[in-house]
């Protein structure tokens, strides 16, 4: 759909250049700020539009066919945001939406996160072993971790968020993060990251409520879909539906729980998991953790042990549990 056919603002009219070289952060942000005033959607037309951090402020994005929103390869283009993650520290992201509702990112275009530009891809992090690795095993190992944007597409404290139809590729770290969000829909996405990049998880839901993930194809160097309470241990992650997805992970295709997390009311159905170090993983690895009311049905799980420092040993289903005592950390 062209910008003129709907209530949309075309970033080109604000001076953005889709040549794959020009840094368009200020131009695209100006379009977003204008749309925040009018209630319109920002349209990314065909072309490769390079950008640093963009703050959505509740504005929706539409990516037309042939559109590529390409993340800058320069860390200086990702200034620190007003958010500190419990595990990943100060937020440096490409797309940020903090505390704004009713955001949709859709279309048939691509978000290219330029992940490999933050790694030396000529080197592999081969663990010490008494048995020498074959070249095939070395090829499966991670790149050494470097400095990189931490969470590429980041939503916090937001309601009514929909991502539909787009393609997201080459993340340097977590691809999509939803923290303390409500009514989230991720439908028909393709997420394709380099399988040698450590921590380039597909989707993280942290302390969220009311989530639907359907008809997605996710290939990642770490977890494809992770459900936890890592950003707010005292708030449960609940009412989650995952269905009709194809998942391929060097770590865990789907992981439920982590340290103190409280997870409840999760259904997983009609998914294919293949070439994964672990299929389904349940982690209640602290006395304060709780996972309850989870139903899994109609799954095909095909695992394969991958060399290197990945989590897992080819288990289709893995459970880590300790006795729950209802303690929640301060």
Residue spans of the language-model regions?
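Extracellular/periplasmic carbohydrate-active domains that bind, remodel
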Residues: 1-330
């Amino acid at each position: 759909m062209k910008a003129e056919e709907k209530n949309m603002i075309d970033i080109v009219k604000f001076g953005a250049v889709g040549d794959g070289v020009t840094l368009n952060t200020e131009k695209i942000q100006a379009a977003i700020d204008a749309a925040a005033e009018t209630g319109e959607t920002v349209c990314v037309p065909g072309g490769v539009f390079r950008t640093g951090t963009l703050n959505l402020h509740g504005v929706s994005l539409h990516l037309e066919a042939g559109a590529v929103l390409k993340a800058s390869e320069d860390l200086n283009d990702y200034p620190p945001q007003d958010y500190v993650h419990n595990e990943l520290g100060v937020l440096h992201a490409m797309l940020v939406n903090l505390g704004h509702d009713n955001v949709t990112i859709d279309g048939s275009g691509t978000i290219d996160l330029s992940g490999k530009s933050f790694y030396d891809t000529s080197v592999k992090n081969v663990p010490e072993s008494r048995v020498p690795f074959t070249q095939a095993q070395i090829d499966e190992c991670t790149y050494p971790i470097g400095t990189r944007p931490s969470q590429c597409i980041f939503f916090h404290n937001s309601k009514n968020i929909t991502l539909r139809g787009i393609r997201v590729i080459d993340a340097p770290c977590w691809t999509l993060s939803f923290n303390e969000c409500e009514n989230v829909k991720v439908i028909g996405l393709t997420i394709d990251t380099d399988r040698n990049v450590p921590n380039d998880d597909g989707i993280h839901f942290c302390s969220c409520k009311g989530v639907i993930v359907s008809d997605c194809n996710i290939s990642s160097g770490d977890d494809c879909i992770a459900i936890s309470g890592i950003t707010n241990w005292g708030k449960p992650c609940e009412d989650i539906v995952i269905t009709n997805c194809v998942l391929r992970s060097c770590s865990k295709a789907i992981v439920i729980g982590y340290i103190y997390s409280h997870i409840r009311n999760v259904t997983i159905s009609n998914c294919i998991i293949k070439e994964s170090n672990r299929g389904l993983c349940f982690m209640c690895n602290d006395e304060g953790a709780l996972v309850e009311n989870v139903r899994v049905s109609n799954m095909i799980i095909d695992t394969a042990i991958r060399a290197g420092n990945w989590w897992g040993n080819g288990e289709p289903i893995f459970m880590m549990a300790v006795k729950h005592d209802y303690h929640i950390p301060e």
